[in-house]
Amino acid sequence: MAAEPNPKNFPVLSYVLARLPSFTAKSPSSSVPPFDIEQPPPSSSSSSIEIVTQMPHLTQPDVLASMTSAISDVAETRSILRTLGPRPDHESVDKARAKLSEIESFLSESFEDIALTDAAAKDEKRRQEMDQEKTWCESILKLDEVHASYEKLLKEAEERLVRIYESAEKNAAEDEENVAAVEVNEEVVGILQHASANPVDRVDLSGRKLRLLPEAFGRIQGLLVLNLSNNKLESIPDSIAGLHSLVELDVSTNSLETLPDSIGLLSKLKILNVSTNKLTSLPDSICRCGSLVILDVSFNRLTYLPTNIGPELVNLEKLLVQYNKIRSFPTSIGEMRSLKHLDAHFNELNGLPDSFVLLTNLEYLNLSSNFSDLKDLPFSFGELISLQELDLSNNQIHALPDTFGTLDSLTKLNVDQNPLVVPPEEVVKEGVEAVKTYMGQRRISMLEEEEKKKMEEEMEQANAGWLTRTTSKLKTYVADVSEYLGSNSPRDPYLERQL
């Protein structure tokens, strides 16, 4: 390997080294640059243009200065290797290694002969020649080791330079964001100024890299729709409660960890999208948003829903809670009588409350991918009379509830990746109608069996009662007869005798 790193393997390092000043005078022998016939280096100008196109910040003086100081060890080693010469080829190294082994073996035998014959000068000349050859072989091996270490050094240096560039690129991006933030702030100020003099019903500030929402936004009268999605908001000001007319609020894809308690004062809010944030809980006050029709809290870190979410969100039709860590639904969920669409896949649900079956308007239900946590469904699951689509895939359900056959509206069913025993696999493969028929017949058979068992028990009880009554009457009759006979029969004189 030549002292100059190949631009193909070390593009950034080659670019930086090519811009280092050279203080060493070129010897006549080094007037022609080394040329590797197997791996000729590409044109320096073309490689420089290519790397600068890919990494434009390389042309910045401060970036280049940082990189130059980071590879001082490479520059020093390169200077030494220029003096030592190119790396010996593989064959030369193998020959030197074999020759060195041969020389060491010869010298060892020679020393033994000297010890035995005590003839110190016998092979002196030969040993001197061998010592010279040994030195030459060792120098070849040492040069190969230095070049190997240099190659490792080049790899480490390239990685260092890439890290420096990435850091510079990140800083540049942050600077650009700061500039953009100033521009956004000017846009926000413009919106607020316009809204103070003119009625505004819609504001769209999505994708503006906003980090902060001014308190003054809460004073925009008549605002119906506010879109703040795809920003970098970490909080929403309490002043948002001043948007009394707000119907739709979208704060999805931000960095929100909490929602303000004042959100419960948005009594006219119908659509709330807080998906793809960092929420671990919802404020209890959200239950007071009684006009909500759609609530999307998917792709967060929720572990539960507010206890009283059901009684007050009576108009909610669509609830999206997928990709959270919810372990159970509150009992009050059964009071969401308007709910039609519920998506809760990819959570940690371990079951459904018995009140869940009160959601008689529910049409779509996705409980898939709760994995090892979800093992069964409520017995009265069949009371969800409006259910049309049901996804239970990727759970641990062994048996569908016995009332499943009464889901007359069900047209789509997915129970893949469950250890189902009831219904059996062959029935599931035939489709949703086959499953409903099987479960319906199974339910009828179970009811008939229960009725038969009940009748048998009643008959046993009736028979037992008749026998008891008969025995009682017989005992009474025997007692009466005994009493009658005892009072009217003459006494036996023999029995009356004194002993």
From Swiss-Prot:
UniProt LRR repeat ranges: 197-219, 220-243, 245-266, 267-289, 291-312, 313-336, 338-359, 360-383, 384-406, 408-430
Coiled-coil regions listed: 138-187
Xref: InterPro entries: Leu-rich_rpt, Leu-rich_rpt_typical-subtyp, LRR_dom_sf, LRR_domain-containing
Swiss-Prot/TrEMBL keywords: Coiled coil, Leucine-rich repeat, Repeat
Effect of deleting the gene: No visible phenotype. Pirl1 and pirl9 double mutant is lethal due to a male-specific transmission failure leading to a severe pollen malformation.
Positions of the UniProt region annotated as Disordered: 25-48
Pfam families, per database record: LRR_1, LRR_8
Gene3D superfamilies per the UniProt record, alphabetical: Ribonuclease Inhibitor (3.80.10.10)
SUPFAM superfamilies membership: L domain-like
GO cellular component: cytosol
GO-annotated biological processes: microgametogenesis; pollen development
Tissue specificity statement from the Swiss-Prot or TrEMBL entry: Widely expressed.
Source organism, top-level taxon: Eukaryota
Motif GVYW per UniProt: ranges: 431-438
Function summary: Leucine-rich repeat protein that likely mediates protein interactions, possibly in the context of signal transduction. PIRL9 acts redundantly with PIRL1 in the differentiation of microspores into pollen.
Family per similarity comment: Belongs to the SHOC2 family.
Record's protein name: Plant intracellular Ras-group-related LRR protein 9
